[in-house]
Amino acid sequence: MLSALPAPLLGLIASTLMLLNILFWVPILLAVSIIKLLLPFKHVRLWIDPLLLRIAEAWIAGNSGWMRLTQKLDWDVTGMESLSPRQWYLVVCNHQSWVDILVLQHVFNRRIPLLKFFLKKELIWVPIMGLAWWALEFPFMRRRSEAYLRQHPEERGQDAATTRAACEKYALVPTSVMNFLEGTRFTAAKHKRQQSPYQHLLKPKAGGITLALDAMGEKFGAVLDVTISYPDGRPSFLQFLQGHVRQVRVHVRTLPVPRLPNDADQTEAARRELCQNWVNQLWQDKDQLLSSYATKTRG
């Protein structure tokens, strides 16, 4: 256990181990992806996609390994019963830090299918990682503002098309579609700017989850409502690497999949409103849970 080392040295060791793990697994991932690209047939995809997922799971296991070696973490995880790697899941979570991604991958690795995150388009240019996300078919979203779309109406619907295309692929092999419904990491400044009605959360957005339900609603076996809390305060990624995070709380709530009406009388706006109301209730429950965590921490 290296957690007793000085923070700068610990951060250097953790960063190095993380980078070595990336440099080992990503080239393997890309090599297999190129084969799939050169042989774009369904039966090839049905063989290669599970192989890509096994490679990604091994990569995540490597991350869990260096985390165990360098971090003295107390994991308080609840609600993991009855999960299956052979089921399709829609996963939603609050978003506080880049550390959330490592936490989610560590907790769910090989317990459910690989988490597929919806990413900002700009992230495809991140060295090495952008290629890895592309190889794993994470959808890249433009996330244009409403003001921009009013000026460029020809771009309206591009994210919807990207989501539908991704979900069509995910329907072939068990997948966990992951969505941070707030769309960005929580900060006090964003919370104030939004005038969020929640104490610990930003306002959730239902657009992406509505599209996923439209495309794959019949495939999803359950919704996993995940709440992450850091009793020591929201950490930066560097603070995590340097060992400043001592405890992580993760609560998983398994919920039935909401069934949106698909009759012709329901407009897209009406369907999105129904989903938004459902999401708002999720967020109200999540905010109450985070408040109870905060009370325990102060106590």
Go through each PLM region and give its residues.
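Membrane-anchoring hydrophobic helices of lipid-metabolizing enzymes
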Residues: 1-89, 95, 103
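Accessory terminal regions of nucleic-acid processing enzymes
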Residues: 19, 262-299
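Catalytic core of membrane glycerolipid acyltransferases/transacylases, capturing the structured
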Residues: 42-46, 51-58, 85-152
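Short His-Asn-centered micro-motif
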Residues: 79, 92-95, 119-121, 180-182, ...
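Conserved glycosyltransferase catalytic-site signature
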Residues: 101, 164, 205-209
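A cross-family acyltransferase "interaction/gating" segment
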Residues: 124-144, 172-265
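A Trp-anchored, charged/polar loop motif used as the substrate-binding/catalytic surface
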Residues: 155-168
